[in-house]
Amino acid sequence: MARTLAELPKGSRITDYISLGVVAKTFPVSTVKTVLEATGRNSRRQRDLPAHVVVYYVIALALYMQSSYREVLRCLLEGVQWLLNPTDRIKVTGKSGISQARTRLGAEPIKKLHDQVVRPIAVEATRGAWYRAWLLVSLDGSTLDVADERANEEAFGRPGASRGQSAYPQIRFVSLVENGTHVLFGTQVAGRRTGELALAKGTLPWLKPGMLCLADRYFFGFEFWQQARATGADLLWRVKKNLQMACEKRLADGSYLSHIYPSQYDRQPQRNGVAVRVIEYQLDGVAGAEPLYRLLTTILDPELAPAPELAALYHERWEIETSLDELKTHLRGARIVLRSKTPELVQQEFYGLMMAHFAIRGLMHEAALKADEDPDRLSFVHAVRVIRRKLPIFPAIPPRGDSDVSR
């Protein structure tokens, strides 16, 4: 397992490495305290680490995964005095004390804060976020390695390998991504033994009318299609080429209308069918391209969304691959595992990681709007460095409504 740094370079301060104001602006102290109260995790007595400080600590852990627990806390406490009562004297506790504080907090309030705050952020002026009147979102999933502890293995499982088992247990997660901003939202996480489709069903409450959701062929099934369609969002999903699709009406743009059915039993008498539009195309001259691509969409009128545009649009789905790469590589750095040693704290750390990614993407979106640029043209790695770099102290001053943070 990769070693963590015992300490940051000499002379380091929190303002050299993190602008807590960016995180606190995204996750205001008042919201954090409301969530803690709702989940019964607010500090009832004076502790070395108040619960709301631990929340920010969990997010900071995601930004500094190569630093030790104690070093992240030391630096954090240098920069969060406005979170504390002026008379508080919070000491930099050891690894055991930090673990106890995180265990008291648990995963529930972190997930609740994530679910309450993390959502699409694109506005009308956001470049690359829209196709005609639709907000573009994609659905996909991935896995992350977690610490090689028996409790984690029992809770999450580990993948097989050509020579025995994989070195690390893994969690699986499925997320929606806002294509234009790369914000991951509606994220669901479980052990590796849980399939992507089961997790994907948990993302559906975040699909809304006015969205166009793109997804790969492995998510398609009649039941899940109907559940996603019921959200009011429009769908553009790839399906396997062996799916039987009858051309019932050829349209001027080359696409055609057809029906999908709950089962083969319903297909023969054409019973309980649902109308779809089918787009089929090839990628000539593209290395590694498959012989045929087939897409289904809920948008039946070709004038609203012509087939050539939808075919090109589908490949926007790979925006989520960029977001997953940011999460797994650029934000985590060289570390190969989430370091928490119990299943509860793994989930806590995971949602802290998701919130750190959201805070960075929010900062990048603001910068893109000011520069009138597509957020894709900005560097995620550079944004991480900006948040870690020394910034003026005033961004860390809480908004007027959060002036009672010492209580």
Q: What would you call each of these model-derived segments?
A:
Residues 90, 130-131:
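Short helix-terminating capping/connector loops at secondary-structure junctions
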Residues 85-105:
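Major-groove recognition helix of helix-turn-helix-like DNA-binding domains
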Residues 118-126:
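A short, well-structured juxtamembrane/interface segment
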Residues 68-87:
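DNA-recognition alpha helix
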Residues 1-69, 75, 103-105, 112-116, ...:
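Single, function-defining residue in the core of a domain
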